[in-house]
């Protein structure tokens, strides 16, 4: 691949700049439903929001209480955020007095056994989705599963792929070139993934009620107010061992060096038995506890801060879609919910992500080895637990480097891309970049820095602060204008999804045992 500066130079003509700008994006935002008291809502998914199994925009994640709002794919950032906002605005009008919890880490939790697993109805597909979640509960506990995040889906235009293909000296087909380039992006993203929790990590503190596992006492927490625990320099406890972790997966070593390596690694992981999970049992006294006793029940259980994706056809598994036609887009999974936005993410973050991901695509991306993977993991853990610590050092290619120095050089490259994306007389990308550049040498300008400063300055408990935000955003979204036509569209979508689920459940089907056997036979 050509050096970054040379490639940027070759993309500076009008047609290439237009090809660069035509990115496709989608957002998935998770949010817990809570009662006005702040306690987790324990009732069923609201019927006015349709079928969680069939609705394209409003579904549930792990729990019946954990809503997920999904946008279609957009090229225009304003349209993307407007769509996400409309879905929120419609939904809050149908929560029967409940609110949305506007941060990643849950708070007022009673017994973890009361957290309701999502229910998708009586069809075999619906039962399988529920059983998968039941397996997650047995494996990792319910608490970890109701931590929420924001996923950002991203792809570049066909025009850009054609231009990059033309500029390359590859012997690959265009489809192979696209997949290998996306895997190059993924490798560079993993090298730089710590940047996202540094800037956008928004879970440096949590309620003491979340700490029910003795192992979490190993963290040197400090206290604000009555029951807020925090680490002074943390950025994202969601991405630490307190959040999404799976020690069983630590030894999978799935390679991102090519699509073929990735698919081979995933196939082996899916079929790898786990002695630990076998102890849970698969079907005990006639009742299923998990889909199987492998390290991964299904591919979705594999935790990674980024995924290669392709829209599935029919009942294809994710790896089958990728094997059929290569990588279509990538999914960024390292974003905390932004508590300063009613919809969990703001436009300046989206523009930063565009620049960050284009940089990951356009930079040379050598293959990664085990020592670099260890370096990547250590850098990420250092930043999520103490990313705002003055003088923090990370490791790059075996050399010690300061976090701020590494960020300075990255922002220089991002600025080159921002200039290509901003038309004459426009500066949206450069303004967004300048906003986050303040955080390079001022950790208080990061989201986590703003949160800790706010909690300390106001001597307020994290839970009380979040509850105030929940109320504020509820009122804002409730007052957000919804036209009659938009309201009718959401009502029709909800009704159509319920009817679609009813039709599926009415169809003749094989037994659930046979359905599962058939699914895993393929």
From Swiss-Prot:
Family annotation (SUPFAM superfamilies): Glutamine synthetase/guanido kinase (SSF55931)
Superkingdom, taxonomy of origin: Bacteria
Enzyme class: ligase
Span of the signal peptide: none
GO BP annotations listed: glutathione biosynthetic process
Swiss-Prot/TrEMBL catalytic activity: L-cysteine + L-glutamate + ATP = gamma-L-glutamyl-L-cysteine + ADP + phosphate + H(+)
GO CC terms of this entry: cytosol
GO MF entry, a single one: metal ion binding
Disulfide bonds: none
Biological pathway: Sulfur metabolism; glutathione biosynthesis; glutathione from L-cysteine and L-glutamate: step 1/2
Keywords: ATP-binding, Glutathione biosynthesis, Ligase, Nucleotide-binding
Any Pfam family the entry gives: Glu_cys_ligase
Entry keyword rRNA processing: no
EC number of the protein: 6.3.2.2
Family from the record: Belongs to the glutamate--cysteine ligase type 1 family. Type 1 subfamily.
PANTHER family xrefs: GLUTAMATE--CYSTEINE LIGASE
NCBIfam families: glu_cys_ligase
Record-linked HAMAP family: Glu_cys_ligase (MF_00578)
Protein name: Glutamate--cysteine ligase
